[in-house]
């Protein structure tokens, strides 16, 4: 998405697709906000550009559209809809494949990128998927209460401090969703409640 016009067309395609499939807009907006915070916090490690951040935001808005087809396998259904739906025709083709892959990988066991993708594109898929998984887990109950207050590099891993939500009851889910991010960072990802 190098040109302003294609970015506007992509935003419009995402908005239309989100509406068409009845996506929870408040959840999508909140997950996008959390994902952008994580994107910024981990930017020294992933070194991805502005285009990747836009794809991440779009994935946050579209990650649950597969529920329109079925709850079971909604990540796969969502990826298919993004790759094939006419509403997405104006989305840049290469970024559309990346977007579809990120949505596919937001839950369950992630799929690797196609071998013919350049290394940078494969890395983008891994990082964007990992960040979306954590952001979505932080708003799993669709309450829009979690706020990332700080991300700290500490003791060979990272501590994500969360306000508005006590992460302890969700420890297993958060650890499961942070597995990809931990692999990319080379250390554990820990969640704790931010001090008030």
Locate the predicted segments by residue.
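A short, surface-exposed helix-loop junction/capping segment
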Residues: 11-16, 157-161
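C-terminal amphipathic alpha-helical interaction region
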Residues: 116, 191-192
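Flexible hinge/switch segments at interdomain interfaces of large molecular machines
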Residues: 2-11, 53, 151-154
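Low-complexity, glycine/alanine/valine/leucine- and proline-rich hydrophobic stretches
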Residues: 132, 138-191
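Divalent metal-dependent catalytic cores for phosphoryl transfer on phosphate-bearing substrates
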Residues: 14-19, 27, 33-152
